[in-house]
């Protein structure tokens, strides 16, 4: 027995020695360290990344101060898979893991960021399963895998050496909750990846949380810069609308001066939708070229709904038959976007049929997976699906949205046209993608929470408006929508806009609200603010692109030294100077925490001292935002849509006697020419009671005309 025991110990020592020798540490980019061990997966997020890191911008960030020694990360490769042990201090808090819906702070939690179409829980299921988290200690961790992964965020202790005699929580438990409470704190994050034959982790160093997040976004290719028209309103028609219905609705918007830039068509525009044919339905849209032309004349861009499961009636079905998975979805093929054959076939057809004819963007649906919490939800392809490229169903599920988007957006890059898509799933390193995530869920508080949560992972989120229970709720949801990355009214099951009738059944029966014109006026006022806000918002996106600072982000990103911000999930920064605090559902008041410094209520210019909480009330047509003292806020005269020749007439509001300079990004708003330095930086300054404007750059056009200055 002793001989066998000794042999076992020797074997373990040898395995451990080999493991240590096999682990490699390498600096990958400025402030980014990679730690690897064993056999790495072919279809990892890093291997699938198409954009080049912006290393010059990464190098310009503050000097790196490592939060811990990369060699202290322990990677174990076993017969089950791979396990990471990553240091975690008691004093730090964690955030991220993609588009989390049911949670904000992640320390002390078990997280499984797995793609799911109805992620109504706090386990980690999500539309965007990003295996990336950030720490208030000033670093980010990205686990480079497309496999289903579980993170134990300081929840479990591994036995090392002698086992102590702690009796545990159950010994004195008085309630069921106490009985099952885990009081064990561990100094590590444990990451479990079944099936993986090796480990690959990227450390994004700070020195601050914000700097670490910037490095992640810049490593991903820089943040997204959508076409400027994408920041206006997108209105989606009822699913069974016909061509004349679209004309009538466009006329309604223009006749009533309701701002709108994009109209979206839902499933019935195709001959078959589940699965998709990608062929215009002649019964509903007999003249699609005429439709596109007429909408263009009205300043409206066209967005088409689809998903990537290819019906036998599709012209590309035959070509994709040998380049798809071995299971169908809704009797349609699942293209192997991870290979080299399917993407060009899929993309080329869309370019010739839609993009070249003027379709401006797409809504890419159903690219997540069936609801994992329900046994009867089985529409998605199974995890054991095999694809010609070698990727399996599990990894394809995690990457399907990102790969699908890459194929579709390549058409616009080839055509030198920027766009702004809608999508239901993305994975890691997606920061550069001009696309907002959406969900079929509809809990308003969760919609608000996902705005700051999205910023932790290089994602954009659209809290779309559908039906409501009251006028108040409709206005509150609209306020949230105009203070997000993409403002969408999704009326796919509503015959008329929800401001004419918020009740679904009454809306579709043609029974409008008695005060519908008054509600319409309220919504118009809110949408006009969105249009006035575009110059500021567009410039925030430009900073995202160039410096990696998310345009929408949690307060803790900017104020990590303030522990009061650690659990503020229902407020967020927009750009550098605006703090948004939306009201959920039909609330008349809410509590707001303001960080250090003085803050101005945008609606009445009342000044609040930071470092405190306040109870505020916001009217239905007011904007629930606070402006940082020392800011210059450019507010434009609202336009009904963004045209190629639009010039925004701007009034600059100066908050305080002394103000920092503010930069507006100026280019054509529609092409990638800015990547060749065809842009201007318009700097707004305030000195000695007077405003100053300086413009530098090579762009010959003009987006902004500074008309007035107001000192508050």
Regions found by a protein language model. Give the residues of each.
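Bacterial N-terminal signal peptides
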Residues: 8-17
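Catalytic-domain carbohydrate-binding cleft regions of carbohydrate-active enzymes
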Residues: 24-622, 627
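Accessory, solvent-exposed terminal regions and/or long lumenal/extracellular loops of proteins
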Residues: 627-712
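Sec/Tat signal peptide C-region and signal peptidase I cleavage site
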Residues: 18-22
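Bacterial N-terminal signal peptides that target proteins for export
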Residues: 1-9
């Amino acid at each position: 027995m002793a001989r066998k025991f000794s042999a076992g110990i020797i074997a373990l020592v040898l395995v451990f020695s080999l493991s240590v020798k096999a682990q490699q540490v390498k600096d990958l980019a400025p402030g980014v360290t990679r730690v690897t061990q064993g056999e790495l997966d072919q279809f990892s997020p890093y291997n699938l990344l198409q954009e080049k890191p912006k290393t010059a911008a990464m190098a310009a960030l503050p000097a790196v101060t490592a939060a811990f020694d990369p060699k202290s990360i322990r990677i174990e490769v076993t017969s089950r898979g791979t396990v990471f042990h990553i240091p975690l201090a008691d004093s730090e808090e964690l955030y991220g893991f993609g588009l989390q819906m049911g949670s904000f702070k992640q320390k002390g939690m078990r997280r499984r960021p797995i793609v799911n179409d109805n992620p109504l829980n706090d386990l980690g299921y999500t539309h965007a399963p990003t295996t990336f988290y950030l720490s208030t200690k000033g670093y980010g961790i990205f686990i480079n895998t497309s496999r289903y992964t579980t993170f134990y965020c300081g929840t479990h202790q591994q036995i090392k050496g002698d086992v102590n005699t702690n009796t545990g929580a159950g010994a004195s438990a008085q309630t069921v909750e106490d009985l099952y409470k885990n009081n064990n704190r561990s100094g590590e994050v444990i990451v479990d990846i079944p099936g993986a034959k090796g480990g690959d982790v990227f450390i994004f160093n700070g020195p601050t949380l914000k700097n670490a997040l910037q490095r992640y976004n810049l490593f991903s290719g820089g943040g997204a810069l959508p076409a400027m028209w994408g920041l206006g309103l997108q209105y989606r028609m009822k699913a069974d609308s016909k061509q004349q219905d679209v004309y009538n609705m466009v006329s309604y918007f223009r006749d009533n001066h309701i701002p709108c830039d994009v109209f979206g068509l839902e499933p019935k525009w195709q001959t078959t939708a589940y699965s998709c044919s990608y062929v215009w339905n002649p019964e509903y849209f007999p003249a699609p070229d005429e439709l596109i032309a007429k909408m263009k004349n009205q300043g409206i861009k066209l967005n088409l709904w689809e998903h990537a499961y290819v019906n036998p009636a599709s012209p590309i079905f035959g070509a994709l038959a040998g380049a798809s998975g071995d299971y169908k979805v809704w009797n349609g093929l699942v293209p192997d976007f991870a290979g080299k054959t399917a993407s060009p076939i899929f993309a080329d057809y869309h370019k010739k049929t839609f993009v070249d004819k003027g379709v401006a963007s797409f809504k890419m649906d159903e690219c997540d997976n069936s609801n994992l919490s329900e046994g009867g939800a089985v529409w998605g392809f199974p995890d054991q699906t095999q694809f010609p490229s070698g990727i399996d169903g599990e990894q394809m599920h995690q990457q399907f949205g990102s790969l699908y988007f890459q194929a579709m957006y390549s058409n616009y890059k080839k055509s030198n046209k920027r766009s702004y898509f809608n999508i239901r799933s993305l994975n890691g390193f997606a920061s550069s993608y001009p696309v907002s995530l959406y969900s079929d869920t509809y809990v308003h508080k969760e919609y608000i929470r996902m705005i700051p949560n999205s910023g932790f992972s290089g994602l954009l989120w659209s809290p779309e408006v559908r039906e409501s229970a009251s006028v108040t709720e409709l206005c509150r949801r609209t306020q949230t929508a105009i203070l997000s990355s993409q403002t969408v009214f999704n009326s796919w099951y509503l015959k008329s806009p929800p401001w004419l009738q918020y009740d679904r059944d009454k809306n579709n029966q043609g029974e409008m609200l008695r005060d519908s014109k008054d509600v319409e006026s309220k919504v118009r006022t809110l949408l006009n603010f969105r249009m006035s806000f575009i110059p500021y918002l567009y410039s925030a996106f430009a900073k995202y692109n160039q410096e990696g600072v998310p345009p929408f982000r949690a307060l803790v990103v900017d104020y990590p030294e303030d522990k009061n911000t650690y659990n503020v999930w229902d407020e967020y920064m927009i750009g550098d100077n605006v703090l948004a605090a939306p009201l959920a559902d039909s609330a008349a008041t809410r509590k707001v925490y303001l960080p250090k410094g003085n803050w101005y209520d945008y609606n009445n210019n009342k000044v609040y001292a930071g470092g405190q909480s306040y109870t505020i009330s916001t009217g239905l047509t007011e904007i629930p935002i606070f402006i940082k003292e020392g800011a210059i806020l450019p507010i434009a005269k609202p336009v009904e849509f963004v045209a190629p020749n639009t010039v925004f007439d701007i009034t600059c509001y100066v908050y305080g006697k002394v103000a920092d300079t503010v930069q507006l990004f100026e280019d054509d708003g529609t092409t990638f020419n800015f990547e060749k330095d065809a842009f201007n930086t318009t700097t707004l300054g305030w000195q000695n009671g007077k405003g100053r404007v300086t413009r530098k750059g090579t762009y010959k056009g003009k987006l902004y005309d500074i008309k007035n200055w107001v000192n508050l």
